UniProtKB/Swiss-Prot annotation:
InterPro entries: GCL_type2/YbdK_subfam, GCS2, Gln_synth/guanido_kin_cat_dom, YbdK
Protein's UniProt name: Putative glutamate--cysteine ligase 2
GO molecular function: ATP binding; glutamate-cysteine ligase activity
Cited Gene3D superfamilies: 3.30.590.20
PANTHER family hit by this protein: GLUTAMATE--CYSTEINE LIGASE 2-RELATED
One Pfam match: GCS2
Highest rank taxon of the organism: Bacteria
The reaction(s) this protein catalyses: L-cysteine + L-glutamate + ATP = gamma-L-glutamyl-L-cysteine + ADP + phosphate + H(+)
Enzyme Commission no: 6.3.2.2
Length: 378
């Protein structure tokens, strides 16, 4: 049960991305029907946004003080988006990759901002038919966001492992728990951030990238975690979109606790050589194996459950406050995350005698059901 009492922790926000599907065949929609985007803007206001493909949209939250507020907002937003989509012959699906969609069918958004992305990144952008979960946590002005970033960075593969929801690509098993992150790796500036010591160094780095023509704007630094370019937050970007809202809330709470611990600790992060040596391997383990990965932590090889327990023990009680439900839910996620569940259901459906396409369609139906699953009591 999520504690609905307002805690005094860090304020945060959540962004969820969705695929738009044709309701008849559950494949990605070629384009949004006339009037659909306008209806979404009217219903969701500033919290609704288009994405880089015409078959994608995003819901971005207001600022929350606790997880119960986030649950109420996103629960209602998911329901409203589903209702609006149904009225236009669509379905809205929140998941890292669509299990059987062909990325070559997706139409790029012609808006100028997205057109520049496709011009700059070419086929890399065209292939990136993926949905993510982004979490913003507010950083007080008295703290340096890059120092906080370097401290939470080593824990991020654990959050990816918990969120992994993209084991399929184009109707085939990808062999990865998070194929989305493999696609992210094709982009520049989208994986592990460099070991910049503080925000002054970060601003100098951005200036160099702009002056050299590598980026058009600061927002084109898309690391797995980054200082936001428009609000005073640290933005988590590593996680796959979560079919179950409860999983997204869990990840937001865990990230919030880790940021809170970094703010309380105030210690300098580990040296970049030691950090990168284990971080790269742990990132691969999370991408490939998810919660079944073997992780290098403090000179030892541990499983995801041990790593989660270490992360929680490290957090001061003040950092844990208001996030206890997230830790409890994460323990359950370790038993079966979305990638595990999708693979198991696909195998079971094939064992029942369904063909590959029929099994994949049924899997999408079940993911759509998960998107609107009732939350634990709040």
């Amino acid at each position: 049960m999520i504690d609905s009492r307002a805690d005094h922790g860090l304020r945060f926000g959540i962004e969820e991305e969705f695929f738009l599907l044709d309701a008849t065949d559950l494949d990605i929609a070629r384009t949004a029907p006339s009037g659909f985007l306008e209806a979404c803007r009217a219903a969701l206001g500033e919290h609704f946004a288009e994405e880089m493909f015409e078959c994608q949209v995003e819901v971005a939250s207001p600022v929350f003080a606790d997880l119960a507020q986030a649950a109420r907002f996103h629960g209602r937003a998911r329901q409203r988006l589903a209702q609006l989509a149904a009225g236009f012959g669509l379905r809205a699906l929140c998941v890292g990759t669509h299990p059987f969609a062909d990325w070559r069918r997706a139409r790029s958004n012609p808006a100028a901002h997205f057109a520049r992305l496709f011009e700059d990144q070419g086929r890399v952008a065209r292939r990136s038919l993926v949905c993510g979960l982004h979490v913003h946590v507010e950083i007080p002005a008295s703290h340096d966001r890059m120092v906080v970033l370097q401290q939470v960075l080593p824990w991020l593969p654990l959050l990816l492992a918990l969120s992994a929801s993209s084991p399929f690509r184009g109707g085939r098993r990808s062999g990865l728990a998070s194929y989305r992150r493999a696609l992210c790796g094709e982009w520049p500036r989208m994986n592990i951030p460099p070991a910049l010591p503080d925000e002054d160094a970060y601003r100098r780095h951005l200036a160099l990238l702009r002056e050299s023509g590598c980026i058009r704007e600061d927002g084109q630094v898309w690391w797995m975690v980054r200082p936001s370019s428009h609000v005073p937050t640290l933005e988590l970007r590593i996680c796959d979109a979560c079919p179950r809202l409860a999983d997204a809330l869990c990840l937001a709470g865990l990230f919030r606790a880790l940021v809170g611990q970094a703010l309380l600790a105030g210690d300098a992060p580990a040296g970049p050589a030691a950090r990168d040596a284990c971080l790269e391997e742990n990132y691969w383990q999370a991408m490939r194996h998810g919660c079944a990965g073997r992780y290098l932590v403090d000179g030892r090889c541990v499983n995801a459950r041990d790593w989660l327990e270490r992360a929680w023990r490290q957090c001061h009680p003040q950092a844990r406050q208001g996030n206890e439900w997230a830790y409890g839910h994460a323990q359950r996620l370790l038993e079966e995350n979305s990638a595990d569940r999708q693979l198991q259901r696909y195998q079971a459906l094939r064992a029942e005698g369904r063909g590959r396409q029929a099994a994949l369609r049924r899997l999408v139906e079940e993911l759509l059901e998960e998107n609107l699953q009732a939350l634990p009591a709040i």
